[in-house]
Amino acid sequence: NRLLNLSVLSLGLTLGAAQAASSLSDVTWTQDADTRQVACTYTLTGDAALVTAEVLVAGEPIDGAHLGFFIGDVNRVIAAGEGHWLSWRPDKAWPGDPQAVTLRLKATAPEDGPDYLVVDLSADRLGDVRYFASAEALPYGGLTNDVYRTEKLVLRRIPAAGVVWNMGSPATE
C-alpha cells in the first residue's frame, strides 16, 4: 500500500513555563491510501503528560463527534519515552475528504486536561482512563450510547479552583 505523508500542522505543546518539562518530538504521521487509516508515532520527553490529537480540515478543527475513533497512546496520560503510537480511522469516524486532513498533537499537564474523563469498568480494561474535550467527542456515538450506562463511567470536571465549601452539617446540629 502506498503511504501518504501527512503534514503536521503543529506540535502544539502548550505548557506554561512551570510545566515546560514535557515535550513532543520525532512525530511522524502517515495515511494508508486504501484504508484511509492514519498512523502516528512520537516521543515524549520530560514528565508524564496528557497527549491529545486534533484533526483539522483546511486549518479548521472538525467537530468533536468525529474524533471518537482514536486508539493507542492518545487521550490519556502518557509516560515519557519513545515509541508511542496512535491511529485514527476516518473511514469509521468522518465522511469527509481525507486528502485535506492535517493533524495537531498536543501535550499538557495532566491537571490541565479536558473536561471529560472516562473510566473503563469492563473486566478486560478495568481502570483504563481516557480524556475528551466534550460529550460529543466520546467514542461510540456520544454519551447517549448504552456503553456509558454499563461499561464506562463518564465524569465531567467542575471548575472549583479557589472555591471554599463545607461538607456535612455544622457542629451545632
Map each language-model feature to its residues.
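Structural beta-strand segments of beta-rich domains
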Residues: 36-40
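Short, compositionally biased
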Residues: 19-22, 102-173
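Solvent-exposed serine/threonine-rich low-complexity stretches and specific carbohydrate-binding patches
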Residues: 63-79
